[in-house]
């Protein structure tokens, strides 16, 4: 039994790729057709890659491995953070700072600085500082929290990274490749499959698609530790009305493609 059904993929719009003018020729093997200037991803191949990728994630999770979640595009940020927090995994949802992996020792010094500032603000010692300095330190703390707060508990390099949109997160992918860290990615038609170890070919722009794949990755990690979630994080929220409206136009195409892809 597959981790995700064809029906789920279709309903989430996972099959909708980019415009035909925005593509990577290396991705051709995962393309089913072209409709009205949009590439349609072959969901039969997506299902096969889901099984391969999720088998790896399940095995890694059962061995206690650490997966770094990466998703800095607007529509992925909240989903990626919630799933990472739910599973107790590190995450990056703001700008990827160069050297997060390849210069991890230096990155740890920034995390140490964040912890130092947290201690200062959580005690009454901050009140001993002049007002101008308090404002400056608060700004520094906020900036560090935004950029490295999600990896503050990552005491070593991750065993793998899970990326939403590897084309946007090119620096993260390059650093992982350089260090031999496996890359798992939800990758659209503009992606280069050659730099991804475990690819899930699919729509990396639509919220429903991102949520389906990322939430299922989270489920695998939770299941691997006996169904225990990180109590510090809430469930994945439903997408906003605006997001639903933006995707309503895809529903008719989904219905038309259900039979053709389901039988292919």
UniProtKB/Swiss-Prot annotation:
Q: Where is the composition biased (Polar residues)?
A: 251-264
**Gene from which the chain derives:** rpsB
Q: Which organism is it from?
A: Deinococcus radiodurans (strain ATCC 13939 / DSM 20539 / JCM 16871 / CCUG 27074 / LMG 4051 / NBRC 15346 / NCIMB 9279 / VKM B-1422 / R1)
- In the record, what terms sit under GO molecular function? structural constituent of ribosome
**Record protein name field:** Small ribosomal subunit protein uS2
- Show the Gene3D superfamilies listed in the entry: Glucose-6-phosphate isomerase like protein, domain 1 (3.40.50.10490), Helix hairpin bin (1.10.287.610)
Q: Do the record's keywords include NAD?
A: no
Q: Which SUPFAM superfamilies match?
A: Ribosomal protein S2 (SSF52313)
The biological processes this protein is annotated with in GO are: translation
Q: Which family does it belong to?
A: Belongs to the universal ribosomal protein uS2 family.
Pfam families xref list? Ribosomal_S2
